[in-house]
Design a protein with these regions (language model features):
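Subset of outer-membrane beta-barrel
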Residues: 1-331
């Protein structure tokens, strides 16, 4: 694991082979829509206090570009530059030789709008959330074997963008399970196959009305009842909504991937992400490559265009660039 574990599963960090790690990532966003001023950037790092303990820090910043606000009649009001950021602080430690546990706390700031529009005072939203991560390291000393992890992430308070106390919404809490098996052929060649499952722990509002365009939407009463639910109880209710087991299966996103490394210096990756058509219908292929030299590593990935017309995903043709540094020798 490298410093990017701060965003996926920090319980992996105590098994890192270097004492200190840093990761920097940059992703131009929505380039397929000819948007040039939107990007996602992240910075992460870890420090191993002992062989079995580590602390980690993560920072994510999302710049949404310049947006022109209008009123209900389409009259231009003002331009605004929305942005969001999250700061994570985590601690992880080994539980025996093969298991580990990680805890993280996160501050979220979502500055989408400010000012008064249509008699409503809008402000930046904020929330405090936490993560609980578990990791099992089943690989042998040469790296071959099965590793897996379980995560409960973004468990936190509701967020609101106005002075109206009834307009608070749930943040996207998530349950994740990931597995990765590595086959080592010799000292120069190895390949890893990975499989991830993710489910949002957020209930669905009852869609008991129709919009002017014929879309199913919640009534004001249903939306108020939905927002009135407690945070902790909403995580449980996200499993017991209408539709039975078939609905629960549809809510699980699936991602598969493979990574090949030659001489621990040159890496090649490919993956596929699937989301049920009734739950968002995101489907795309990815490819990537990595190169390591001394303490530094460079990573690159690309999302292939998928779909057409209204079904084309906005993230088509998205590139991601990353730098990884591992320092301090072995710990």
């Amino acid at each position: 694991p490298d410093a990017n574990a701060a965003f996926a599963n920090i319980a992996r960090t105590p098994f890192a082979t270097s004492k200190t790690g840093i990761a920097v990532n940059y992703t131009p966003w929505l380039r397929d829509l000819s948007v040039n001023d939107v990007f996602l950037a992240s910075l992460a790092g870890y420090y191993k206090i002992t062989d079995g303990q580590a602390i980690s820090l993560g920072l994510r910043y999302f710049k949404l570009g310049s947006i022109q606000f209008t009123d209900a009649q389409g009259v231009e009001l003002q331009k605004y530059n929305p942005n969001e950021f999250a700061v994570d602080l985590g601690y992880s430690r080994k539980l025996g030789k093969k298991n580990s546990l990680g805890l993280a706390i996160r501050y979220i700031n979502s500055n989408l709008a400010k000012g008064t529009f249509n008699s409503v005072n809008y402000k930046a939203g904020s929330s405090i959330a936490g993560d609980l991560h578990f990791y099992h390291h089943g690989a042998k000393e040469n790296g071959q074997g099965l590793n897996w992890g379980l995560t409960l992430s973004n468990l936190g308070s509701k967020i609101s963008y106005s002075s109206d106390a009834t307009q608070k919404d749930f943040i996207p809490a998530n349950l994740g399970l990931g597995l990765a098996y590595t086959k080592v052929f010799d000292e120069s060649n190895k390949i890893t196959f990975a499989l991830d499952f993710n489910k949002l722990l957020v209930p669905t509002a009852k869609l008991d009305s129709l919009s002017a365009s014929g879309q199913r939407i919640p009534t004001d009463a249903s939306l108020a009842k939905y927002r009135d639910q407690g945070v902790a109880s909403s995580w449980i209710k996200s499993f017991g909504e209408g539709g039975g087991i078939n609905n629960e299966i549809q809510e699980v996103n699936i991602a598969i991937g493979a990574e090949y490394w030659y001489n621990n210096q040159f890496g090649f990756r490919a993956g596929y992400f699937y989301e049920n058509p009734n739950k968002g219908n995101r489907k795309y292929f990815t490819v990537g490559a990595g190169i390591k030299y001394s303490v530094a590593g460079l990573n690159f990935s690309y999302i292939f265009p998928t779909g057409s017309g209204t079904s084309r995903i906005p993230l088509s043709n998205t590139y991601r660039f990353g730098l990884v540094f591992e320092m301090g020798g072995k710990k």
